[in-house]
């Protein structure tokens, strides 16, 4: 894979109609400095507001991915972003004279060809790859969607679609080399829908810019003349221009590839993956993906990336099975011996869950008085260990971590199930249940040899230290 970041040599523009809004728009791709990423700019609005193409800015996923900040939005970003991501361009300023990029032929190819004609320039800064070193999974059982990222020193993507619709059936496609395959094998693949969906989408106020030249319509139902006329009126075309066809595609249009729908789903996933803000080294397997599931999957990748960033910041020596060792913990928490009551963090999902380990030894100072001849770890110190575990989850991500401290506001439903003795290993799991600004609630449980020994619900807040 490429080493250095890339941008454009020159700017280039394209003009056309937006797929869903139907508004005419000119899109202009411009070079951008290193570490800029992709930034959409609405030049048709006063002050030309900018919207970075990042997953946190996704506001809608109805038949496309829409990003926005406040009232300013950019619709259907996926084909543009797929072209940039597929050509491995890292930094680009994307100016729009309307709310939606032009659909053109319904694929990414016109954008990709335009970007190549503008020229690609290598930059001095190295690419910031997200390297996947563990399995990351997204599942939606209700929609039978599964997307998985696996460790790989490179990039591959495989997509399977199965609409349980005899007009399309099951298809799959795989991309194994961006350099060799993206431009010719995937960028030309057009957006598609089923004939049975067209009227409903028109009633939703979308596909205003769609026509038979920029979308594949798969015929999955037969229509009589009256129904054809009704459909034509809905989508604003002449009924004489609609032919159900003999090949299963409206107007007998030919597919560019036998599995073009599956390839287009892969293209959409590439475009949504670009919202991560960095290229990925991984093998990605996706069954029945769509924009909603793509976005949720990328959110999981972002949490993984944020966690890794924090781990690199505090954990200077990589250790198998350890996210933060005792040295990293002391860089995060202000506690010190004898009141630092956790030894390492072994699992960490940002803003979701954290698991710590506390090795309980006879050398603990509290065993001298609790109790002589019958040493038992005080329950309040188990609660404190839970609190410190949750505190790490709360403090991570704070830029001024050295100037922050966690204060506890409440302890509820505390239960002590079994005594903790010298030689035991406490495994403490804290799961965030609510986060509002600086106040966090989480449920904590402590285990010894797989048995629950203590549990409690805790509430805490992050505040700045007072001098």
Swiss-Prot record:
GO terms for molecular function: (3R)-hydroxyacyl-[acyl-carrier-protein] dehydratase activity; metal ion binding; UDP-3-O-acyl-N-acetylglucosamine deacetylase activity. The active site is at residues 291, 370. Keywords: Cytoplasm, Hydrolase, Lipid A biosynthesis, Lipid biosynthesis, Lipid metabolism, Lyase, Metal-binding, Multifunctional enzyme, Zinc. It is found in: Cytoplasm. Residues 1-306 are annotated as: UDP-3-O-acyl-N-acetylglucosamine deacetylase. GO terms for biological process: fatty acid biosynthetic process; lipid A biosynthetic process. GO terms for cellular component: cytoplasm; membrane. InterPro entries: FabA_FabZ, FabZ, HotDog_dom_sf, Ribosomal_Su5_D2-typ_SF, UDP-acyl_GlcNac_deAcase, UDP-acyl_GlcNac_deAcase_C, UDP-acyl_N-AcGlcN_deAcase_N. Its EC number is 3.5.1.108, 4.2.1.59. Pathway: Glycolipid biosynthesis; lipid IV(A) biosynthesis; lipid IV(A) from (3R)-3-hydroxytetradecanoyl-[acyl-carrier-protein] and UDP-N-acetyl-alpha-D-glucosamine: step 2/6. It catalyses: a UDP-3-O-[(3R)-3-hydroxyacyl]-N-acetyl-alpha-D-glucosamine + H2O = a UDP-3-O-[(3R)-3-hydroxyacyl]-alpha-D-glucosamine + acetate; a (3R)-hydroxyacyl-[ACP] = a (2E)-enoyl-[ACP] + H2O. Zn(2+) binds at residues 79, 264, 268. CDD domains: FabZ (cd01288). Residues 307-467 are annotated as: 3-hydroxyacyl-[acyl-carrier-protein] dehydratase. Signal peptide: none annotated. It holds the Pfam family FabA. Its main location: cytoplasm. Its cofactor is Zn(2+). PANTHER family: UDP-3-O-ACYL-N-ACETYLGLUCOSAMINE DEACETYLASE 1, MITOCHONDRIAL-RELATED (PTHR33694:SF1). Catalyzes the hydrolysis of UDP-3-O-myristoyl-N-acetylglucosamine to form UDP-3-O-myristoylglucosamine and acetate, the committed step in lipid A biosynthesis. Involved in unsaturated fatty acids biosynthesis. Catalyzes the dehydration of short chain beta-hydroxyacyl-ACPs and long chain saturated and unsaturated beta-hydroxyacyl-ACPs. In the N-terminal section; belongs to the LpxC family. In the C-terminal section; belongs to the thioester dehydratase family. This is Bifunctional enzyme LpxC/FabZ. The lineage of its organism: Bacteria, Pseudomonadati, Chlorobiota, Chlorobiia, Chlorobiales.
């Amino acid at each position: 894979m490429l080493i250095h970041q890339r941008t454009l040599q020159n700017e280039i523009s394209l003009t056309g109609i937006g797929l869903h809004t139907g508004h005419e728009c000119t899109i202009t791709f411009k070079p951008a400095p290193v570490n800029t990423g992709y930034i959409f700019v609405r030049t048709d609005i006063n002050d030309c507001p900018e919207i970075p193409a990042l997953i946190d800015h996704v506001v809608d996923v109805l038949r496309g991915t829409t990003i926005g900040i406040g009232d300013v939005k950019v619709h259907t970003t996926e084909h543009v972003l797929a072209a940039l991501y597929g050509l491995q361009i890292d930094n680009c300023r994307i100016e729009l004279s309307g709310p939606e990029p032009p659909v053109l032929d319904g694929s990414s190819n016109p954008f990709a060809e335009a970007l190549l004609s503008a020229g690609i320039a290598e930059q001095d800064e190295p690419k910031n790859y997200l390297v996947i070193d563990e399995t990351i999974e997204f599942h939606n059982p209700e929609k039978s969607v599964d997307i998985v990222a696996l460790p790989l020193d490179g990039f591959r993507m495989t997509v399977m679609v199965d609409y349980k619709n005899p007009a399309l059936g099951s298809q799959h496609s795989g991309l194994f080399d961006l350099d060799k395959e993206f431009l010719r094998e995937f960028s030309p693949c057009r957006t598609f829908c089923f004939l049975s969906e067209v009227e409903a989408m028109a009633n939703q106020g979308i596909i205003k810019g769609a026509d038979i030249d920029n979308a594949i319509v798969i015929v999955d139902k037969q229509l009589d003349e009256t129904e054809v006329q009704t459909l034509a009126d809905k989508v604003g075309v002449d009924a004489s221009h609609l032919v159900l066809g003999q090949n299963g595609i409206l107007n007998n249009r030919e597919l560019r590839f036998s599995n073009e729908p599956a390839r287009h789903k892969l293209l959409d996933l590439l475009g949504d993956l670009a919202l991560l803000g960095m290229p990925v080294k991984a093998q990605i397997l996706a069954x029945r993906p769509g924009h909603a599931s793509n976005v949720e999957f990328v959110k999981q990748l972002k949490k993984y990336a944020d966690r890794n960033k924090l781990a690199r910041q505090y954990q200077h020596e990589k250790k198998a099975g350890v996210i933060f060792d005792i040295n990293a913990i002391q860089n995060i928490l202000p506690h010190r011996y004898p009141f630092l009551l956790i030894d390492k963090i072994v699992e960490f999902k940002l803003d979701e869950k954290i698991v710590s380990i506390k090795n309980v030894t006879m050398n603990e100072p509290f065993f001298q008085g609790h109790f002589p001849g019958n040493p038992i770890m005080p329950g309040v110190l188990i609660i404190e260990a839970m609190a410190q575990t949750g505190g790490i989850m709360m403090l991570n991500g704070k830029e001024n971590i050295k100037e922050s401290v966690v204060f506890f506001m409440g302890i509820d439903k505390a239960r002590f199930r079994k005594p903790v003795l010298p030689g035991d290993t406490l495994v403490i799991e804290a799961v965030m249940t609510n986060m509002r600004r600086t106040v966090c609630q989480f449920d904590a449980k402590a285990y010894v040899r797989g048995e629950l020994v203590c549990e409690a619900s805790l509430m805490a807040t992050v505040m700045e230290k007072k001098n």
